[in-house]
Amino acid sequence: TGIEVDILANGDLDQEDNLLAQLDIVVASIHSKLRMPREEMTRRMVLALANPRVDILGHCTGRKVMGSGRPPSEFDAEIVFAACARFDVALELNCRPERQDPPDELLELAVQWGLNFAIDSDAHAPGQLEWQAYGCDRAAQAGIPPEKIVNTQPAIDLIAWAGSNPA
């Protein structure tokens, strides 16, 4: 079982540790205060990544490139991706077409950092599950090998990886 939790402005998660301890996968994402100053946003993200319950950093920029759009949050990607590497947190490759998150330049940087990835459709309705193929195409174009994509692994290996960070 898994959950997507909100990263609060102070870097805490919006769910209690006793709940998170019962889950196999925890995706941490920012859903509010997306316009924080760069240094504060970087600190917020790193604090969340240091939480041993966090397995995946979701839609890291929060941007939307279609419709009314939304600019990406500003953060120091080198510092955030270094934290992902240090704490073995995968980076979500969000397949929602209006997100395209992370953008290509951050995806390239994450590959350079040797990060693991989780491809996620971000589906909110059954017909949106087909977006997964878009994420797979982006991963292939970015040169991400299947072994760096955590959700291509057998379930037992995925759960073992997610449980490898001591709480």
Language-model segments: which ranges?
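Charged catalytic cores and adjacent phosphate/nucleic-acid-binding surfaces used
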Residues: 9-167
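Phosphate-binding active sites in nucleotide-utilizing proteins
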Residues: 1-2
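Active-site beta-strand->loop->alpha-helix modules in alpha/beta enzyme cores, enriched
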Residues: 6
